[in-house]
Amino acid sequence: MNKTTHYIIALIVMLIFNHGYSQMNYSVKVETGFLKYQFNTVHVDPGPNWKGYNLEGENGIDLNVINGIDFKNKWFIGIGLGYLNFEGLNGLSMFSDFEYLPLKTRLTPLVNLKFGYSHLWNQYENGTGAGLAELCFGINFKLTERLDIYTKSGFLITQQSMLIPIRFGIRF
């Protein structure tokens, strides 16, 4: 390929990235929620060292901070860190967060998906770690161009338990 072709390809790539970056914004979400315990997803035939399920009927609360990128004010992709408290059992969670707002109106539905890891300091030595998966649906209300509030609920599976999260949050 000659120099002209290289310059044209470089120009096209720069224009594509320039257009893409102009529609991306750094964004932060802060959310809190109530986690209503439903049931254990695993049933255990107890052995001599078994100390009980990771969560045994405990409801919880959490506080999450998520840093990410908004793309075209419809898609949000981020990484989050959360504090968990299940009736005295403390823990941390780390997760990836994907959110979709289908409409660009002031009031719009939202779909949220989280995948990650949670660790609880419970009755087991050094606590227990487990995968985390959450699917939520809710409503997003745009207060200003850069400030949204939202509420959502759905299903959360972690620590061998199924929970119903009811969350409220703010995005800026």
Segments (PLM) and residue ranges:
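Transmembrane beta-strands of outer-membrane beta-barrel proteins
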Residues: K29-G33, G80-G82, L110-G116, K152-G154
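Residue-level signature of outer-membrane beta-barrel architecture
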Residues: I69, Y100-P102, I139-F141, I170-F172
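Repeated loop/turn-to-beta-strand initiation elements of outer-membrane beta-barrel proteins
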Residues: Y26, K74-I77, T105-P109, F141-I149
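Glycine- and aromatic-enriched membrane insertion/assembly motifs of diderm outer-membrane
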Residues: H43-K104
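Bacterial Sec-dependent N-terminal signal peptides
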Residues: M1-S27, F172
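Gram-negative outer-membrane beta-barrel proteins
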Residues: K36-V42, N85-L89, K104, H119-Q123, ...
